[in-house]
A protein has these predicted regions:
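Cell-envelope and extracellular/periplasmic
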Residues: 1-246
């Protein structure tokens, strides 16, 4: 990210601005970056650097140009799950910055341990095309389910989301493995995930003790992306360390 941040290195940023101006401008910017910053040191600076790049781009191009961002896929040999909080930083950036959108990148095929395959990139391009069309040209909305609330309910945990008409499962996988719940006693195993129209209901191995925090797909190997919105077939946007309300 440092090479895209004018306050740090910024060489790639300056090259981008030069090429956009030479081409006469663009209607939007597609942003797919983050794997190189999936470590504790770089991730800590990512939110500030990305926000500064968006601000600088709009200033230098003289318009409130929209950004369409994508979370990283997965890193099959990366053991440090904590570093992949970068996905949560990207999710929150789309919530807090004007005209910044985000798509998940769950379950797409890889060509190696980290990079999308050609087939994966084609699928990602199709998703982006639909989102850009829906946003810029007045087409059908194409936003992925995004966590809105995590609430204790009769000993279970109910999840509600933005941008969902109803959930469905594409295939019978072990969805519980994509979630991680921690509380004052440490890890609390998710035993099952049930679809309840627009919500998901999680059952846990024990009651939540003290403060609880839930993550989904924030680990390097996931998520599978088997639970999708029926209308768009988009999977849930990965989130990390969202507090459980009581």
């Amino acid at each position: 990210m440092a090479r895209w941040d004018n306050a740090r290195n910024g060489d790639l940023y300056r090259n981008m601005i030069e090429k956009i101006k030479a081409a006469g401008g663009v209607r939007a910017i597609l942003w797919y970056q983050g794997c190189a910053d999936a470590d504790a040191k770089n991730a800590a600076q990512y939110a500030e650097s990305f926000a500064r790049m968006v601000k600088d781009t709009r200033r230098d191009l003289g318009e409130e140009i929209p950004f369409f961002t994508m979370q990283p896929n997965r890193y099959e040999t990366q053991p440090d799950a904590a570093s992949w909080g970068i996905k949560e930083i990207q999710r929150r950036s789309a919530l807090t910055l004007e005209k910044v959108h985000i798509l998940p990148n769950a379950g797409l095929p890889l060509s190696d341990e980290i990079h999308n395959s050609s087939a994966g990139n084609v699928t990602l391009g199709q998703m982006l095309a639909r989102q850009v069309h829906g946003t810029l040209n007045g087409g059908l909305p194409f936003e992925a389910p995004d966590i809105k609330n995590v609430q204790l309910e009769n000993g279970n945990i109910r999840l509600s989301f933005r941008h969902v008409s109803a959930f469905t499962r594409l295939r019978p996988l072990h969805d519980a493995a994509d979630f991680c719940l921690t509380d004052d006693l440490g890890k609390n195993e998710i035993q099952s995930v049930s679809v309840q129209e627009k919500d998901l209901l999680l059952t846990t191995a024990r009651s939540v003790q003290g403060k609880g925090y839930l993550s989904y797909g924030a680990h390097p190997q996931g998520p599978e992306g088997a639970i999708v919105n029926q209308q768009t077939y988009l999977p849930i946007i990965s989130f990390d360390h969202v507090e459980v309300s009581k």
